[in-house]
């Protein structure tokens, strides 16, 4: 007699690992090539299309790191206080207009260009001043409190590499080097749609058996956070003909199509067959939990990623697969999120052969930080994402996790705005 399964993941068969799926994405997806020039004020989050080469040193000149007195170190008496007349003043943007003479001190302020003839700055807190003369204590090293031209960035350096997603510090560096505009890749145009006869827009009447569409709004936010221009194509019914029409229309005007729902093996799941009718399906089942049914294909030459219908599986598969696809397509490099080793504050058993992503929060336990698993594992429990800090990742080979074992932790802050 056949054994009935009580585990929806029991009949996995030969499934792709997420590493294999990511390699497929790397091989099959080519970045956009169109660029545009934008002012710094609106460049945050955009992908830099060309290296920024420094055309100047940063800082552009030697300058003082503190408020104090600039002197020539050779003029200081090694074993006792040195008294010097203060004969000039240098402030940021108002440098001394002559070389400093031997045996004199120049009053200097933070950021001011070092006067010619000086090489050391004595902090004002370490000095005594009386009757126009400053007393400088012995023992200061030559070059103290002096910032050198080019110690941050040297002329000719690659200050920012192409492929960088521009953050606030990047824009500051670009501005400090005199750039008012930057060449960036144009934003991706992404078509987004949900599938399912049971799915309704929020606020609409909700008949028995229907649910409100959470996925489209989560995905829209995640896509916008990656700088995409999103076309919301709404909810499409569970009919192959309707999906074929929607996908064909979307492929004509977009760089990427993202769907949720309809990628499993049920009689009402038609995304897979629609993609096969219109183009090519590269894969559609992965050895991960949650999120086994995930489709990657092409429709009219446009990449399509079909995500599951359960909202937790949508989040996990987006972060694991869709996000790398989008960053590659957008021209971004070095976008792999950081994983952090933490101690497991829980025990857990899993089936070998699939990678699992467990929702967890970080808690302090003595001097250590531990990951505590959310109590319920269901792929439809959206509140588990809201109330967790990130995902504990258990590799395919793992079968049992004991308390105190080091695990990889992916914070949501690394991958979600």
Regions of interest found by a model, annotated:
Residues 13-20, 35-38, 42, 66, ...:
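Conserved active-site and cofactor/substrate-binding residues in soluble primary-metabolism enzymes
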Residues 26-33, 51, 114, 157-163, ...:
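Structural signal for hydrophobic packing residues in well-ordered secondary-structure cores
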Residues 1-81, 333-357:
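Short, low-complexity N-terminal leaders and the immediately following helix N-cap/first helix
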Residues 19-22, 36-41, 50, 93, ...:
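Flexible glycine/proline-rich
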Residues 1-19, 180-307, 311-317:
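Helix-rich terminal scaffold detector
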Residues 2-13, 52, 69-232, 368, ...:
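Short, glycine/charged-enriched hinge/interface segments at domain edges or termini
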């Amino acid at each position: 007699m056949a054994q009935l399964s009580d585990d929806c993941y029991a009949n996995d068969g030969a499934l792709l690992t997420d590493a294999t799926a990511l390699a497929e994405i790397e091989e099959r997806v080519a970045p956009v090539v169109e660029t545009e020039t934008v002012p710094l004020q609106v460049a945050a989050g955009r992908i830099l299309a060309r290296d920024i080469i420094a055309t100047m040193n940063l800082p552009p000149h030697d300058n003082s790191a503190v408020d104090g007195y600039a002197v020539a170190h050779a003029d200081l008496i090694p074993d006792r206080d040195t008294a010097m007349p203060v004969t000039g003043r240098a402030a940021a943007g108002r440098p001394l207009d002559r070389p400093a003479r031997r045996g004199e001190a120049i009053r200097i302020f933070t950021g001011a260009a070092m006067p010619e003839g000086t090489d050391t700055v004595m902090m004002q807190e370490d000095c005594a001043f009386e009757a126009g003369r400053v007393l400088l204590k012995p023992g200061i090293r030559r070059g103290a409190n002096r910032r050198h031209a080019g110690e941050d960035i040297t002329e000719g350096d690659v200050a920012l590499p192409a492929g960088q997603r521009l953050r606030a510090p990047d824009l500051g560096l670009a501005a400090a080097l005199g750039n008012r505009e930057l060449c960036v890749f144009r934003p991706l145009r992404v078509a987004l749609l949900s599938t399912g006869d049971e799915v309704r827009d929020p606020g609409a009447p909700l008949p028995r058996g229907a649910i409100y569409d959470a996925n489209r709004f989560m995905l829209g936010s995640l896509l916008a956070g990656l700088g995409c221009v999103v076309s919301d194509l709404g909810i499409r019914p569970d009919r192959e003909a309707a999906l074929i029409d929607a996908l064909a229309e979307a492929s004509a005007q977009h760089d990427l199509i993202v769907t949720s729902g309809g990628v499993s093996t049920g009689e009402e799941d038609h995304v897979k067959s629609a993609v096969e009718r219109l183009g090519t399906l590269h894969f559609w089942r992965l050895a991960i939990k949650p999120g086994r049914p995930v489709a990657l294909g092409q429709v009219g030459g446009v990449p399509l990623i079909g995500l599951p219908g359960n909202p937790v599986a949508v989040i996990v598969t987006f972060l694991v697969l869709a996000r790398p696809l989008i960053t590659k397509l957008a021209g971004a490099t070095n976008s792999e999120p950081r994983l952090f080793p933490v101690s497991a504050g829980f025990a857990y058993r899993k089936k070998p052969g699939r990678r699992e992503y467990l929702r967890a929060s970080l808690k302090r336990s003595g001097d250590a930080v531990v990951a505590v698993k959310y109590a319920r594992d269901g792929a439809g429990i959206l509140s588990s994402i809201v109330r967790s800090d990130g995902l504990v990742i258990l590799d395919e080979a793992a079968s049992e996790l004991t308390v105190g074992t080091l695990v990889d932790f992916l914070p949501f802050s690394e991958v979600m705005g």
